[in-house]
């Protein structure tokens, strides 16, 4: 039996799509030295090669892919988006604005200098910034503003071509910039990170291990009573001295949960809860008492829950003010915008931050009720809210502004982005509304992006060889400039205008570029995870600004809007 693969793929768009995705994802796992190609560039390269062989795909799939992707970007940004505008995130907002605005202006200037059309220029901006949101915003605005223009198809092909030619240039140059730029400035990055760690009481260890608290019980002996010196538990401050707290006391056969006024007596049996290393460091006064193995005394349900910060008594408060340990709970992680933050007593909590907390189930529930809510342990997505806000985003995208002489519409990209932000924001405030498991959100976002990249590559592949010969050299030069010059401008602005700590500044710069591989290099250079504070500060707003930059570059290009 003979199978004509070419005819099979040509006649079956779904099969073609998944063949492109499978081959592209395999290619994306390859590494060039320490740099992994990544799924996006893998799918794009495969689709470009097949596009050269005149394979094509239904554009509806491409449109659906970009819509799903940009909507999910908004949902992820929503919980922390508005706090950036209203509080101490102004520096991060300004850095993200400087990064995006400078890249946009430089791209426009180079496009005019090399006499490119808007497709090549916008594609070059998206690739140099390694930003799919720019590509999505530009592509959608092109379709909205030039629907009746016979050049639309060519401009869309050029958009894909510009992105494909400059993506690797942007990624590699930024990684090298992240490696060497910190060495060119006079402040040592590890020293800057240690300075922040000292000032804020951060854990500067990038390999911090997280253990579940354990329970051990002891019979109180004379040494421990002498050590307590008649003070009650509140006055002793057991946790601050030992890292453990007394959860239960058995006295004269009666088991009770002690309050702060309790005073230890010889013969008491106490249940201590703490991390293993805290138990190991206990004062000999505790260990000199005989360890007790009592089922009732040790029968506690230690749980670990993710608590979403929501309530006013925690939002805009420092972590130290929440006083988790006073409520018998242990903090394992602080997560913001899916980025793990250093444990910092002075970090200001934002609405939507996630605190991973361990402790007795009752105590954890009490803390969750006080500061927010426990994240839902469910794999069920609120599809009704997802679909409703998706429809709202499409409706917003239909809005058109009419001015004398020209008009322009908001477009699907901006509309869906805004609707996604609102869904994410509402989800952070209402625990039972709009729940989307993070795994499901990641899957939809990644799948939408891959479908979009496959469609982009297949449509642009036919003209790639001709375009590469005409503008290939210019694209490489322009890609380097747009990738690196805004980074330098952002560094100068942050260092000498905002006077930011260098570790935070370089983290914020990588967040403004939304580049996780470069962020890893900055963490290694600082021998700390302190830069994650800066990365989280700019990442969410940068994704939104980059999408708007893709829209704006089309609108301001002469002759497009009219």
UniProtKB/Swiss-Prot annotation:
GO biological-process terms attached to the record: potassium ion transport
Annotated localization: Cell membrane
What sequence ranges are listed for the domain RCK C-terminal? 202-288, 290-373
**What's a single GO MF annotation on this record?**
monoatomic cation transmembrane transporter activity
- GO cellular component assignments: plasma membrane
Spell out where the chain crosses the membrane. 8-28, 32-52, 66-86, 94-114, 118-138, 158-178, 383-403, 406-426, 443-463, 477-497, 541-561
Membrane association type: Multi-pass membrane protein
**Alphabetical UniProt keywords:** Cell membrane, Membrane, Repeat, Transmembrane, Transmembrane helix, Transport
Where the protein is mainly located, per its record? membrane
Q: Gene3D superfamilies this protein is in?
A: Regulator of K+ conductance, C-terminal domain (3.30.70.1450)
Q: Which InterPro entries match?
A: AAE_transporter, RCK_C, RCK_C_sf, Transp_YbjL_put, YidE_YbjL
Similarity-based family: Belongs to the AAE transporter (TC 2.A.81) family. YbjL subfamily.
Q: What is this protein called?
A: Putative transport protein NT01EI_2530
